[in-house]
Amino acid sequence: MSNNIRIEEDLLGTREVPADAYYGVHTLRAIENFYISNSKISDVPEFVRGMVMVKKAAAMANKELKTIPRKIADVIIQACDEVLDKGKCMDQFPVDVFQGGAGTSLNMNTNEVLANIGLELMGHQKGEYQYLNPNDHLNKCQSTNDAYPTGFRIAVYASNQKLIDAINQLREGFDRKAKEFETILKMGRTQLQDAVPMTLGQEFHAFSVLLNEETRNLHRTATLLLEVNLGATAIGTALNTPEGYQPLAVQKLAEVSGLPVVPAEDLIEATSDCGAYVMVHSALKRLAVKLSKICNDLRLLSSGPRAGLNEINLPELQAGSSIMPAKVNPVVPEVVNQVCFKVIGNDTCVTMAAEAGQLQLNVMEPVIGQAMFESIHILTNACYNLLEKCINGITANKEVCEHYVFNSIGIVTYLNPFIGHHNGDIVGKICAETGKSVREVVLERGLLTEAELDDIFSVENLMHPAYKAKRYTDENEQ
């Protein structure tokens, strides 16, 4: 063995492993076998932490049940803390996020890294597994089929909380704009046609409420991840675990993670079923749908500036065209739209992978993980990007907004209780044909007085409509 390599052995024979690597031969083979995306497990630190938490919880349970020597358990726990508390070896998880084997490559990567950290703590060299073994000690009372999905669930839950934080900050940004724009009267639109007036503040407040609904939905679905199959081992029969291990390991995981994890109701079902991932990613898809709709609205409201709605101005961030001078595009809402499309596509991936399970195991969890972590990551970044580069800098074109209101035909709807729907149709048709305002036509036809129109079309009443029509007190009154 040279200074640059060490020799390790597995089922398939011996291999040379870089001497300074904390991973071992199993990880080396995975690197060679799966060169798919150039995205590594190290790029998802929450996943690394989730797996290490599982190993720490297992070591604590094994120590208490005396299934491994106390000194070995203590070293494993200390090695886990080196990663969890100090961030040691976070770059030692080079396995591609796309991997066959239901996650065995990541499970063994974790076992090897922790074993080699532990060996150094014991005063031994990396790879001297006769003292601390990745399989016999780090993987004690575990299988990839319970360790991997449990670590995955912990990781997705933690990542989900970061996304919720980002959504809340974006929501607060919309709230600030809602307050800023609360007195700006504008035209509401349905089917892209003039409807009735509202305030720009109300429009932005609706965006905020919409996002608040999504945080509640994400919270609700994320609780499904807290039911874990740790202790199930290979297929859910708890093979090679002592009595009491499964509930104890889950209890220790709750202590280590600070999360209220609970044992799955049926370990065989939990080991093969991926329904929770479908539900959680469905919530991500729903957020993407809503967020994309908001961005569509922002692009429409800022369209122009001369031949569009031009009700709001988005921050000018970069030149918009290589041929058209002075053109500036809504690039941030556009990129958020694209993020949302990708998340919606990922949802199809998760659905198909969850369906692809066979008998007692679903081997497609790695691609579910890739899709879920990507969706959460890009949605989190998109929320911050939209807030910082767009929402915070939006300004309103008050005069344009009010011009649309007072020159619209839609405000005739306010007159329905006074002149009736049929007269409203006639007024609207005349306005459309002649270009006259609703006020002009109503006065010409003698349907209402100037004073009555002033009251009905007051800014206050247009912003906050009050019922001003007749109320009937006698049943016989016509």
Curated annotation (Swiss-Prot):
Classification via PROSITE patterns: FUMARATE_LYASES (PS00163)
SUPFAM superfamilies: L-aspartase-like
Domain of life: Bacteria
Pfam families assigned to the protein according to its UniProt record, in alphabetical order: FumaraseC_C, Lyase_1
Keywords linked to the UniProt accession: Lyase
GO biological process, any: tricarboxylic acid cycle
Cystine pairs: none
Positions of the catalytic residues: S321
Region feature (SS loop): 320-329
UniProt catalytic activity: L-aspartate = fumarate + NH4(+)
GO cellular component, one term: cytosol
Keyword Lyase: yes
An example molecular function term from Gene Ontology annotations: aspartate ammonia-lyase activity
EC code: 4.3.1.1
Residues holding L-aspartate: T104, S143, T144, N145, T190, S322, K327
Enzyme class: lyase
Family annotation (NCBIfam families): aspA (TIGR00839), PRK12273.1 (NF008909)
Family per similarity comment: Belongs to the class-II fumarase/aspartase family. Aspartase subfamily.
Function: Catalyzes the reversible conversion of L-aspartate to fumarate and ammonia.
Record's subunit section: Homotetramer.
Protein's UniProt name: Aspartate ammonia-lyase
Protein's organism: Serratia marcescens
Lineage, uppermost ranks: Bacteria, Pseudomonadati, Pseudomonadota, Gammaproteobacteria, Enterobacterales
